[in-house]
Regions:
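Domain-level signature for soluble enzymes in the chorismate/prephenate branch of the shikimate pathway
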Residues: 1-293
């Protein structure tokens, strides 16, 4: 793991005076990620959908930006979010890799033998199925892990539990009856920190960039683009193809580029100009570190 992933580099300071848009409810993993970037006191603006998140983040009167999940180490890329980002005027200024820990939460005093049903998002239930199948519990799917925790708290039920974050337990005064019940312990979600283009700060010691490009799809053209990247000594840490809306099975490409010197990135951008129809730089930032969820 490099120094950036260990968190040794200087950490930029991001302004959050108007609040930070997140997808989901308070107590969600988006809020956990926001706290790791902005601090525990950060005010979050819950959004029902990622489209709402982009809209709120783009409004200077509504927020100071957003935290948005972009991929998971098990489920893969959240493809619609790449399209939302491409159409927006937001910039990526940071990233964080959150270790996802799913926990069984109950009202104070509730024991395992009291539980009759467990509420959570379908993905969280699926991630914890090996643990849950040990018990004859009814599994209730909901729209959000944190919302499940909130409902268990509000109903004061002795027979209901929720699967959610430890932050949700803290916010809704629930006990963590069983921590880290997910089957796969190495489960990470990558979150992007977004700011409006005109307000995006220059990142000291930046060593990563996210870009999108389209080629003319002639024979070998993608290989030529990748050769330019390799010749500059840049590590291509991600390459994701996406259909171009309205085209006849033509694709654009999202790429994450890791570099040591900014001149390497400049060399790539100059080198691929003649090989691409369009290029958009989503942001230039520091490679993120792994933090506990």
């Amino acid at each position: 793991m490099d120094k950036q992933k260990k968190g040794i580099v200087e950490k930029p300071v991001f302004e959050c005076g108007k609040g930070i848009a997140i997808q989901g409810y308070e107590g969600s993993f988006h809020q956990v990620a926001a706290r790791n970037i902005y601090g525990k006191a950060v005010e979050v603006i819950p959004c029902a959908t990622f489209r709402d998140l982009i809209r709120i983040a783009s409004d200077k009167n509504a927020s100071s930006g957003a935290i948005m999940a972009i991929e998971n180490s098990i489920a893969g890329s959240i493809l619609p979010n790449y399209n939302l980002l491409q159409k927006s005027k937001l910039k990526v200024v940071a990233e964080v890799y959150l270790s996802i820990s799913q926990n069984l939460l109950v009202n104070p005093g509730v024991k395992l033998e009291d539980i009759k049903e467990v509420h959570s998002h379908p993905m969280a239930i699926l991630q914890c199925l090996e643990y849950l199948e040990q018990y004859n519990w009814k599994l209730v799917e909901t729209e959000d892990t944190a919302l499940s925790a909130k409902m268990v708290h509000q109903h004061r039920s002795k027979h209901a539990a929720a699967i959610a974050s430890k932050l949700a337990a803290e916010l809704f005064e629930l006990d963590v009856l069983a921590p880290s019940i997910q089957t796969m312990k190495n489960n990470f979600t990558r979150f992007l920190v977004l700011q409006r283009e005109k307000e995006a700060i220059d990142i000291p010691m930046a060593n990563k960039s996210s870009i999108y490009f389209q080629t003319n799809h002639s024979k070998g053209i993608l290989a030529k683009v990748l050769t330019v990247i390799a010749d500059a000594g840049i590590n291509l840490s991600k390459l994701q193809s996406m259909p171009i809306p309205g085209s006849n099975f033509k694709y654009g490409f999202y790429a994450d580029l890791e570099f040591e010197q900014r001149a390497q990135l400049d060399q790539v951008m100059e080198g691929i100009e003649s090989l691409t129809n369009s290029v958009k730089v989503f942001g230039i930032y520091q490679s993120g570190k792994i933090v506990k969820g």
